């Protein structure tokens, strides 16, 4: 697995991996002995909020950018504003890290942001609307907060990207990866809901790995001990005292609380 190198990358970025992040990195980075490159071409990650998902995405993107020359890494968010905020936070972290010498000066102009590295690779943030239906050459791309997509938009993105993956695999020798990451959404999150429901029913494609962190269906999201037991970052990024503060922020919004910290879908009932 490539997980050990991802872990070292995280340390050099100044954000050592939490146990759950290392587990995901180890599995997602498994190497196919028949090809010598990544076994999985698709990684689906469903997590509660406040768990360090963004840190893992940034670490995986950085590792992928440094895998070889002229690699193309894209981070997709619901809007351009969301993507660019995430990108600016990452660039700031990178600039202060031990990996800064490998990075060139970032381009921060609106609509044209990218972080290039000395080897010619780049990481670029985009709004999903800029990508849907368009084939883009890429080595790794992440659809973050996938709950925001309806089924048609999500499939348009995947259908546009899939043909380019074989081209890049042939050109670089490294299996491209699509990452789909999100907290559970609502009944309107038809793209993500379809994926998760299919996986939970046991219909997981051979080259897809998926991770589903959250409270069990029969658990009480108002029980703090339940949240502490099942949230992958409990006691690591925050404690029970902070959990009480988080709950107060969701006063009068029980479904929003269960969704954010239990990763439970809000079906509006």
Task: State where each predicted segment sits.
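Phosphate/NTP-binding elements of NTP-utilizing enzymes
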Residues: 1-269
């Amino acid at each position: 697995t490539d997980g050990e190198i991802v872990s070292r990358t995280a340390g050099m970025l100044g954000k050592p991996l939490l146990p759950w992040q290392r587990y995901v990195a180890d599995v997602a980075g498994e190497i196919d002995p028949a090809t010598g490159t990544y076994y999985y071409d698709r990684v689906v990650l469903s997590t509660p909020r406040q768990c360090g998902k963004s840190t893992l995405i940034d670490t995986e993107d950085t590792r992928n950018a440094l895998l070889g020359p002229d690699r193309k890494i894209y981070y997709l968010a619901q809007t351009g504003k969301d993507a660019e905020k995430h990108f600016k936070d990452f660039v700031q972290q990178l600039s202060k890290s031990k990996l800064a010498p490998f990075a060139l000066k970032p381009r921060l102009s609106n609509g044209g942001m990218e972080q290039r590295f000395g080897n010619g690779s780049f990481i670029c943030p985009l709004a999903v609307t800029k990508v849907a239906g368009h084939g883009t050459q890429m080595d790794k791309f992440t659809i973050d907060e996938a709950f925001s997509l309806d089924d048609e938009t999500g499939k348009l993105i995947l259908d546009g990207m899939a043909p380019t993956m074989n081209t890049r695999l042939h050109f670089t020798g490294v299996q491209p990866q699509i990452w789909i990451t999100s907290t559970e959404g609502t009944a309107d999150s038809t793209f993500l809901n379809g994926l998760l429901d299919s996986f939970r029913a046991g219909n997981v494609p051979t080259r897809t790995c998926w991770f589903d962190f959250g409270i069990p269906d029969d658990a009480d999201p108002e029980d703090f001990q339940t949240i502490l037991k099942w949230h992958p970052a409990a006691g690591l990024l925050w404690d029970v005292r902070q959990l009480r503060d988080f709950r107060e922020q969701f006063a009068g919004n029980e479904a929003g609380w269960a969704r954010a910290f239990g990763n439970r879908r809000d079906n509006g009932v």
